[in-house]
Amino acid sequence: MKQYAIQPATLEFNAEGTPVSRDFDDVYFSNDNGLEETRYVFLGGNRLAERFPVHSHPLFIVAESGFGTGLNFLTLWQAFNNFRSEHPQATLQRLHFVSFEKFPLTRDDLALTHQHWPELAPWAEQLQAQWPLPLAGCHRLLLDQGRVTLDLWFGDINELTDQLDATLNQKVDAWFLDGFAPAKNPDMWTPNLFNTMARLARPGATLATFTSAGFVRRGLQEAGFTMQKRKGFGRKREMLCGVMERCLTPTISAPWFYRSGSEKRETAIIGGGIASALLSLALLRRGWQVTLYCADDKPARGASGNQQGALYPLLSKHDAAINRFFPTAFTFARRLYDALPVSFDHDWCGVTQLGWDEKSQQKIARMLSLALPAGLASALNAEETTQAVGVTTRCGGITYPAGGWLCPEQLTRAVIALATEQGLQTRFRHTLTSLAAQKSQWQLRFASGEAASHDTVVLANGHQINRFDQTQPLPVYAVGGQVSHIPTTPALSALRQVLCYDGYLTPQNPNNRQHCIGASYHRGNESTVWREEDQRQNRQRLLDCFPDADWAKEVDVSDNSARCGVRCATRDHLPMVGNVPDYHATLTHYADLADNKASAVPAPVYPGLFMLGALGSRGLCSAPLCAEILAAQMSNEPIPLDASTLAALNPNRLWVRKLLKGKAVK
């Protein structure tokens, strides 16, 4: 996915007021009655009204080949909402909709189109509020208080399906095969698409499509579906329905990065910061029993305890995985933070990263060459920067208009309080000293001498994540740092955005009239002792970058107010999310991986042991999506990332990359 920005759809409206694609010269829905056609073709064709009450799983997964205006999704959501009202005790509790769209509508066009269906307004307004930027890849939207999940994959469906992770295989309960007519858009209706539909369909899955074209019917039959014709809607004579009656065995293309989940729904999370807080919520939403063990007397005592933290995506001049992951993580984080029913200090004031010297200017130029959507990142010259940030910098940069700052300490504690209301059990002053697999559970031992047993365990305890026998070989390291708290002044109070340079400076928090400036960096140092030199350096870096700025000289660190914390990082600047890998088994099983990829077994891991760590300095950006990824993996649900980006987050990646090249792992 080298292309990051997606071209939005170009629309016009015909005499009936129906939107028409200029790209394909075809209507988005029937001129007669698009809503009733959707109900007939897709809901009726998949027999959803019959299947929902007898569905034996808490989640029903629908996949769709063209999102368009969202009519199919909104109609299904309305029907699912009615089903839940009429059957509150049913096993089926949640709906997951996966859809692909090459040319997404703009938010304005979406809202205009939705005016056709006033009865769908309650659901359409929620969709419009979370409508993502035209950015390639998967956008996960959590709707209806988490009861409905929408995965919007922006891009060409036949390219995207090749990039789907193997964990989506045999998960789909029903397919909506939609899109522009085969005669108008032949590139979509391919054997590759039909085979992908079969690969993702679970045994017994159904499909429905408005077309009755012979090559479509034959292609789906060859892929494994049993097909039949059904009377079409309105003036259309026929449509197609199908059932996956076979049990296919899809191959796993990269077993060394395979992710396994759990059939159980009980876990212990070790941590107390933002990662463990958000993971608790994500698992509780899926019906898990969750116990949180925290070594401290309250949450957010570690790296998540700062007063202000900047929220913006990390971009790289050369690493494609970073450029795929962080923009997606950032947009998901904004949607999640905005939807949380909790209060915490924050201001989405924007973040501007400055090019204060030649090296930083070259770096920013390479970041801008990614051509990300303007709503995510765009260039500023020196004059525009001054207007945006409120102070004179005499340099331009790259701005993130949807970024800003928040209080990690307040957020973490508020999320854990919310999770506690939803059933989270908390155990503070519990320092985990060891864990061992015992039969089908994990035995935990704490410094107090206490012990506990749990079906699964998640390690989300920051820089202490490699303190155990199972995790000691992980290539992670601690980074100590100090953030200085400074009082505002008339000149500093003019700062309207977070400034990033060879450090960062936040606007004042109006609730305490303080700014945060930082942060020092001490790799391999776990000390949380205040340092006078760090305090001085935090100020000096600002002055070095902007020697002529009078406002910068007003930064006063003399009252020695600061906070010291320790982060956990990796050398490739990406988190580690997934199963805890078995280091020794990995080296043994994959000793000849470079020459025997075809016979490789799935990645050796510790069953039931997971991790969410190495978030580095961008935990506020990455933690929400990482928590969602891990909760989905543990629950055997669709994961909202492509396979190559997921591989770049796999805790075993640094070892496996060497083994794939025939190199020794040190």
Swiss-Prot record:
UniProt key word S-adenosyl-L-methionine: yes
Record-level GO cellular component terms: cytoplasm
Places the protein is found: Cytoplasm
Region annotated FAD-dependent cmnm(5)s(2)U34 oxidoreductase, chain positions: 270-666
Pfam families (alphabetical): DAO, Methyltransf_30
GO BP, one annotated term: tRNA wobble uridine modification
Annotated stretches, region: tRNA (mnm(5)s(2)U34)-methyltransferase: 1-245
Function: Catalyzes the last two steps in the biosynthesis of 5-methylaminomethyl-2-thiouridine (mnm(5)s(2)U) at the wobble position (U34) in tRNA. Catalyzes the FAD-dependent demodification of cmnm(5)s(2)U34 to nm(5)s(2)U34, followed by the transfer of a methyl group from S-adenosyl-L-methionine to nm(5)s(2)U34, to form mnm(5)s(2)U34.
The protein's name: tRNA 5-methylaminomethyl-2-thiouridine biosynthesis bifunctional protein MnmC
Gene: mnmC
